[in-house]
Amino acid sequence: DGTHYPFIGAVGMIRSGYGKYANMTLEQQNAEIARLGEQTTDWFDELFQNSVSNSHYLSLSGGSEKNSYYVSLGYSKNNGLVKKTDYERYNVSAKLDMKPNKRVKLGISADMAIQESTSPSLNVDPFKYAYFANPYERIYNEDGSYAADNTYYSITHANGAYDKLLPDGGYNIFREINETSNETKNMSASLIANLSVNILDNLSFEGLASYGYVTNASDNINGKTTYAAWQDRPFEGSASSISKRTYGSITQTNAYNTNYNLRGQLHYFNTFGRDHYISALLGSEIRGQYSKSIYEKRYGYDPISGNSSIPIYPESM
C-alpha cells in the first residue's frame, strides 16, 4: 500500500535487510543481533571527562621609602569536557617604583601572558553524537583498528534522507579525536615607563613611554584517513562523488601586532593673590602601530615528517 515504516536502530536495519544485512536468513539476523547485544558502549563516558581546573599564583612585594617593587606569577590549566581538550595560561607581572630624590619619580611595569589550547578539529558535535550514537557500535575492531559506525549516518539514509558519502574506512569519532588537532598559542607583552620631574615648585614634566606586542598562531591538522579530510578534497572537483582519494591537510595562521606610544608634557601652574590661578600645558605625543597576518593551507600533509605533497587534479577534469 506504499506505507513506509521507519527503521529503528541497528535492529530495524537488520530485520529490514538494509545494506550489508541484505539476504540474511532469520538465523543469521538473530546471530548478528546477539553479537551486537554483547557490546554496550557508553558514549558519554567514552567521549567526555571531568573538567578539572587548576590555578596557582605567587606574588612578592617589598622595598623601602624610596623604592618599592611588586612581582606576580600565575599559572592555570583547564581540562575541557571533551577528551584531548585542554587550556593553559602563564602570566607574569612586575612593577618597580623609584624616587631618587624629592623631585623625581620613576615607574616601570611589565606584563606578559602566554595562552595555549589544544583540541580535536571535530566537524561533528560530540554532544549530539553521544546522544544519538548506537550503544551497539564499537570503538575498535578486534585487530585494534577503528571500527566503522554502521548506523549514525546510515540510519538516516535508510529512512529516506540524503546518502552521505563516507570514506572506505567509514566514520569513527575516535579517529577524528586522535588524528585531527587544533592548536593555538597566543602571547601578549607590554612595557610601560612613567617619569615625573618637578623642575621648579610650579613647573613639572610628565613623560610616558609604552610598547606592546601581541602574537597569535594556530595549526589545524586533519589526518589523511579522517572524515574531516574526506570532506575537504578540492582536488577531486566534480569527481568527488565517485573518487575515493583522500589526503590530509594543515591550515596555519600567524598574526602579530606591535604598538608604541611616547608622550611628554610640561605643566606650569601658579597662584596670584587669593583669587587668581594660572595653568598652562604644553605637550606632544607620538604613537604607532603595525600588524601583519599570514594564512597558509597545505594539502597532502604528513604530520610525522612535516612535509606535504600537493595532489594533482584528475586527468578527466
Mark where each language-model region is.
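Short structured motifs
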Residues: S55-Y57, I192, I250
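Periplasmic N-terminal accessory/gating domains of Gram-negative outer-membrane beta-barrel systems
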Residues: T41-S51
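Alpha-helical support elements that line or immediately flank enzyme active sites
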Residues: I192, V197, Y211-Y213
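Surface-exposed loop/interface segments of Gram-negative outer-membrane beta-barrel transport/assembly proteins
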Residues: D1-T40, G80-T85, N91, K95-S188, ...
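Predominantly transmembrane beta-strands of Gram-negative outer membrane beta-barrel pores used
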Residues: L47-F48, S55-K77, L81, S93-K99, ...
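Residue-level signature of outer-membrane beta-barrel architecture
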Residues: G62-S64, Y75, M98, L195-V197, ...
